[in-house]
């Protein structure tokens, strides 16, 4: 009987450090995200930050901005910039995209993708000539 008591006491003593070490692992693996959410809520509340809801998945915000934009020339649909011609539209993310003008006044924005300056435009030109 004494041996059984010692075994149970040993198991209970070891259970606490195991739960502390692997508790979050088991929570994440089996869907118990309560502890993580509580921590995030405490962090947001503790620093005076409020958690904002995600942007809705409908286009109403964009459409409202588009309708409010005043432009007597051409209003670029992706940046809402007012320009003289469609191919003058800027890229939405100029630090990360190169602009390439295509035939018939069209333009595209291509990810720079870590290439050196002008490399994306060079590849587009090669593709246009059928060399890529």
UniProtKB/Swiss-Prot annotation:
Matches recorded under InterPro entries: LCL2
Keyword set, alphabetical order: Signal
Signal peptide as annotated in the record: 1-20
Annotated segments matching region Disordered: 32-59
This protein's record includes keyword Isomerase: no
Residue pairs linked by disulfide bridges in the UniProt entry: none
Biased composition (Low complexity): 35-45
The keyword Signal belongs to this UniProt entry's keyword annotation: yes
Function comment: Probable component of the endoplasmic reticulum-associated degradation (ERAD) pathway.
Family indicated by similarity: Belongs to the LCL2 family.
PANTHER family recorded: LONG CHRONOLOGICAL LIFESPAN PROTEIN 2
Name by which UniProt lists this protein: Long chronological lifespan protein 2
Gene symbol of the encoding locus: lcl2
């Amino acid at each position: 009987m004494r041996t059984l008591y010692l075994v149970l006491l040993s198991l209970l003593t070891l259970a606490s450090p195991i739960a502390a070490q692997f508790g979050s692992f088991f929570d994440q693996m089996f869907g118990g995200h309560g502890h993580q959410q509580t921590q995030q809520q405490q962090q947001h509340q503790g620093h005076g930050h409020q958690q904002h809801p995600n942007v809705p998945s409908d286009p109403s915000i964009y459409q409202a901005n588009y309708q409010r934009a005043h432009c007597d020339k051409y209003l670029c649909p992706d940046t809402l910039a007012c320009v003289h011609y469609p191919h003058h539209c800027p890229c939405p993310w100029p630090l990360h995209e190169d602009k390439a003008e295509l035939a018939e006044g069209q333009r595209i924005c291509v990810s720079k993708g870590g290439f050196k300056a002008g490399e994306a435009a060079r590849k587009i030109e090669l593709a246009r000539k059928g060399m890529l």
